UniProtKB/Swiss-Prot annotation:
<feature type="domain" description="Helicase C-terminal">
    <location>
        <begin position="252"/>
        <end position="413"/>
    </location>
</feature>
<dbReference type="InterPro" id="IPR000629">
    <property type="entry name" value="RNA-helicase_DEAD-box_CS"/>
</dbReference>
<feature type="domain" description="Helicase ATP-binding">
    <location>
        <begin position="71"/>
        <end position="241"/>
    </location>
</feature>
<dbReference type="GO" id="GO:0003724">
    <property type="term" value="F:RNA helicase activity"/>
</dbReference>
<keyword id="KW-0347">Helicase</keyword>
<keyword id="KW-0694">RNA-binding</keyword>
<comment type="function">
    <text>ATP-dependent RNA helicase which is a subunit of the eIF4F complex involved in cap recognition and is required for mRNA binding to ribosome. In the current model of translation initiation, eIF4A unwinds RNA secondary structures in the 5'-UTR of mRNAs which is necessary to allow efficient binding of the small ribosomal subunit, and subsequent scanning for the initiator codon.</text>
</comment>
<dbReference type="InterPro" id="IPR001650">
    <property type="entry name" value="Helicase_C-like"/>
</dbReference>
<feature type="short sequence motif" description="DEAD box">
    <location>
        <begin position="189"/>
        <end position="192"/>
    </location>
</feature>
<feature type="short sequence motif" description="Q motif">
    <location>
        <begin position="40"/>
        <end position="68"/>
    </location>
</feature>
<keyword id="KW-0396">Initiation factor</keyword>
<dbReference type="InterPro" id="IPR014014">
    <property type="entry name" value="RNA_helicase_DEAD_Q_motif"/>
</dbReference>
<dbReference type="GO" id="GO:0005524">
    <property type="term" value="F:ATP binding"/>
</dbReference>
<comment type="similarity">
    <text>Belongs to the DEAD box helicase family. eIF4A subfamily.</text>
</comment>
<feature type="binding site">
    <location>
        <begin position="84"/>
        <end position="91"/>
    </location>
    <ligand>
        <name>ATP</name>
    </ligand>
</feature>
<comment type="subunit">
    <text>eIF4F is a multi-subunit complex, the composition of which varies with external and internal environmental conditions. It is composed of at least EIF4A, EIF4E and EIF4G.</text>
</comment>
<protein>
    <recommendedName>
        <fullName>Eukaryotic initiation factor 4A-7</fullName>
        <ecNumber>3.6.4.13</ecNumber>
    </recommendedName>
</protein>
């Protein structure tokens, strides 16, 4: 969220609103149109029969709030900016919109979806393929850390949708392995991360190569003003579906903190929790890759079965670890913020922030794992003296109260 807070200060949610007004000024109403139609069921949305079959087979019964308002405008071909918290079915919203509009008789890339991490791109690929199963959709994920030749071979054979990370997608466009001629839909997922300084230039480069008349969808959990500002350059009369600040409360997830006197005592606190609680699956977040390795080693020496994943590991190793965690053969995953957005594990009941995130907005991506699609979850934050300011910032940012962990925590899981 660079540029929102003065250097050296913590993020203040009030600056978000002031900055957005300043950026958009009096043109705000002209640039955005709010979209307020609500559909209480998937059947009422006018979707293809085989898409509905895929949606129900995937396990959806009733559309979430973002799906009730977000699927239809995308299906109508409108440019859309949609904001909803992590775990609310955002991915299925744009996947449904894409799948509804594809011409399946034309085996050419018609939709391009960009995501900030390999894990998230692969997760989107899985959702797109599952929802489009009865439609015969061909989807491919172009991500770094995989074979360029294999990407070229699959793209040459023909796909309807490409999901990928900006670097590899731009490489495929540059090599002309991915031909943009038939692309009519362009989606940015996790736009807050995508449009951060690291990816902005690559996204511009990709956008320049796409056909001029293209539908653009921007989907994100948080929507910093710089993301809104940049979308002005890409989008034509977009409709906006933004969650009001007061609504971003991560409903259904109970949030607690534990005061820990010293950093060195966090390990004892963690082990005590695992000895007293019956936990099905949990994710533990720390702030550095080195700490992932350190904590994994310490937990294993105390006979706790844990898995670990971070950005220094090669893609194949990370895939194997995530597969084990999804299948339940590993119950505890230790990781960093880098991979928070790619973890989609339905049975996660507990998220532990061993370290509080360094940015308030990352808190959402971390604990949004623990109560996906209405499943209840618990988030526990370890807080040392130096963290008190950040805990206060997080509570103000999301308009939530995080209470001290009660003695009867076992009853909550």
């Amino acid at each position: 969220m660079a540029g929102l807070a003065p250097e050296g200060s913590q993020f203040d949610a009030r600056q978000y609103d002031a900055k957005m007004t300043e950026l958009l000024g009096t043109e705000q109403e002209e640039f955005f149109t709010s979209y307020d139609e609500v559909y209480d069921s998937f059947d009422a949305m006018g979707l293809q029969e085989n898409l509905l079959r895929g949606i129900y087979a995937y396990g959806f019964e009733k559309p979430s709030a973002i799906q009730q308002r977000g699927i239809v405008p995308f299906c109508k071909g409108l440019d859309v900016i949609q904001q909803a918290q992590s775990g609310t079915g955002k991915t299925a919203t744009f996947c449904s919109g894409v799948l509804q509009q594809l011409d399946y008789s034309l085996v050419e890339c018609q939709a391009l979806v960009l995501a900030p991490t390999r894990e998230l791109a692969q997760q989107i690929e899985k959702v797109m393929r599952a929802l489009g199963d009865y439609l015969g959709v061909k989807v491919h994920a172009c991500v770094g850390g995989t074979s360029v030749r294999e990407d070229q071979r699959i793209l040459q054979s023909g796909v309807h949708v490409v999901v990928g990370t900006p670097g590899r997608v731009f490489d495929m466009l540059r090599r002309q392995s991915l031909r943009p001629d038939h692309i009519k839909m362009f989606v940015l997922d996790e736009a807050d991360e995508m449009l951060s300084r690291g990816f902005k230039d690559q996204i511009y480069d990709i956008f320049q190569l796409l056909p001029p008349k293209i539908q653009v969808g921007v989907f994100s959990a948080t929507m910093p003003p710089e993301a809104l500002e940049i979308t002005r350059k890409f989008m034509n009369k977009p409709v906006r579906i933004l969650v009001k600040r007061d609504d971003v409360t991560l409903e259904g997830i109970k949030q607690f903190y534990v005061n820990v006197d010293k950093e060195e005592w966090k390990l004892e606190t963690l082990c005590d929790l695992y000895e007293t609680l019956a936990i099905t699956q949990s994710v533990i977040f720390v702030n550095t890759r080195r700490k992932v390795d350190w904590l994994t080693d310490k937990m294993r020496t105390r006979d706790h079965t844990v898995s670990a994943t971070h950005g220094d590991m090669d893609q194949n190793t990370r895939d194997i670890i995530m597969r084990e965690f999804r299948s339940g053969s590993s119950r505890v995953l230790i990781t960093t913020d880098l991979l928070a957005r790619g973890i989609d594990v339905q049975q996660v009941s507990l998220v532990i922030n061993y370290d509080l995130p360094t940015q308030p907005e990352n808190y959402l991506h971390r604990i949004g794992r623990s109560g996906r699609f209405g499943r209840k979850g618990v988030a526990i934050n370890f807080v040392i003296k130096d963290d008190e300011r950040m805990l206060s910032d997080i509570q103000r940012f999301y308009n939530v109260v995080i209470e001290e962990l009660p003695a009867n925590v076992a009853d909550l899981l």
